[in-house]
Amino acid sequence: MGYEEIKNTIATIEDFPKKGISFKDITPLLLDHKKMNFIIDELAKFAKTIDFDIIVAPESRGFLFGLPLALNLKKPFVPIRKKGKLPREVISQEYELEYGKATIEVTKNDIPANSKVLIIDDLIATGGTTVAIQDLVTKLGSTVVGQAYLIELVGLCDYEKLQGKFFSMIKY
């Protein structure tokens, strides 16, 4: 099993969700437990090179990789949710999308102050979600020490804005 096999399993859907977008559909990977285990193992290899306390991942596809990785490494997992989805007191962060604004939230006490945080997500493009997560973590008095992604859309992100050690498996 290798990265090329993983890349060849990801479906590219042209003009979805709108014209000019090449959507990377990871659903075919979810159908193959061996490939998913390989991905989690590769993310774990990277994560083991970092001293961190907590894994966070954004809704919803980030959960598919963040939680299994946290279980694999016996670390806490904290979900980053869309606005209005968490029942307890939250910290919010608004950020820009290409078509407007969005807000993400985390439950206030789930990331203790001075925690070292690892961000996991399925894909990084412009980095907008990642920077918003970094801002949330900072508001809670903690630090992002690393981030890892299954897919990186190369050249779209301002990498200078990203905090900590960076890893991506598949590049387009």
From Swiss-Prot:
Alphabetical keyword list: Cytoplasm, Glycosyltransferase, Purine salvage, Transferase
HAMAP family linked: Aden_phosphoribosyltr
Family: Belongs to the purine/pyrimidine phosphoribosyltransferase family.
Catalytic reaction annotation: AMP + diphosphate = 5-phospho-alpha-D-ribose 1-diphosphate + adenine
Cross-referenced CDD domains: PRTases_typeI
GO BP terms: adenine salvage; AMP salvage; purine ribonucleoside salvage
Classification of source organism: Bacteria, Bacillati, Mycoplasmatota, Mycoplasmoidales, Mycoplasmoidaceae
EC number: 2.4.2.7
One Pfam family in the UniProt entry: Pribosyltran
Role description: Catalyzes a salvage reaction resulting in the formation of AMP, that is energically less costly than de novo synthesis.
UniProt-annotated location(s): Cytoplasm
Name under which the protein is recorded: Adenine phosphoribosyltransferase
PROSITE patterns, alphabetized: PUR_PYR_PR_TRANSFER
UniProt GO MF annotations: adenine binding; adenine phosphoribosyltransferase activity; AMP binding
GO cellular component terms given for this protein: cytoplasm
Subunit record text: Homodimer.
InterPro entries tied to this protein: Ade_phspho_trans, PRibTrfase_dom, PRTase-like, UPRTase/APRTase
